[in-house]
Amino acid sequence: MLVIHQRLPARSPRWDEELHLTYEARSKSRLRCFAASGEEVGLFLERGQPPLADGDCLEARDGRLVRVVARSERLLHVTCASPLELTRAAYHLGNRHVALQVGDGWLRLLDDYVLKAMLEQLGATVEAIEAPFQPEHGAYGGGHHHSHHGEAEFNYAPRLHQFGVRR
């Protein structure tokens, strides 16, 4: 088994192996899967990190470099007649904490018939496609929770904005 514990800070121009993974698989810090060659792989990455992205490189325990490839998956490709309508669609999806890939004049999300119906009700054009999914990571670092229990554990600094010092 190819055992991987480390993400590399930069992409590498060369690699020894590839992992073709869906977005869900790239979001896990612990995963048993298979490399493109068929070799069994065990991922044991640091918890609390952003999902792996297409092109990211990992280092295996035996020194081999492994490149991550975003596997194509079934997505909804959303367009609207105006920027305002697209903004409304993004608002309603964000209100439901849906992972979104944002492009110039379009949104993409994992295929979901309930969200498709909602988007069509909002006037969006929704097309089912097969493509790699690379959603936004979000504005804040660390984990996601709504509880104030154990607040110190989850006291992550904002990545985009500094609103003030938390004590």
Curated annotation (Swiss-Prot):
InterPro entries for this protein: UreE, UreE_C_dom, UreE_N, UreE_N_sf
Subcellular location: Cytoplasm
Gene Ontology terms describing biological process: protein folding; protein-containing complex assembly; urea metabolic process
Main location: cytoplasm
Gene3D superfamilies: Urease metallochaperone UreE, N-terminal domain, UreE, C-terminal domain
GO cellular component: cytoplasm
Xref: SMART domains: UreE_N (SM00988)
Superkingdom per UniProt: Bacteria
GO molecular function ontology, one term from the record: unfolded protein binding
Keywords on record: Chaperone, Cytoplasm, Nickel, Nickel insertion
SUPFAM superfamilies: Urease metallochaperone UreE, C-terminal domain, Urease metallochaperone UreE, N-terminal domain
UniProt family annotation: Belongs to the UreE family.
Function description: Involved in urease metallocenter assembly. Binds nickel. Probably functions as a nickel donor during metallocenter assembly.
NCBIfam families: PRK13261.1-1, PRK13261.1-5
Name of the protein in question: Urease accessory protein UreE
Organism field: Pseudomonas aeruginosa (strain ATCC 15692 / DSM 22644 / CIP 104116 / JCM 14847 / LMG 12228 / 1C / PRS 101 / PAO1)
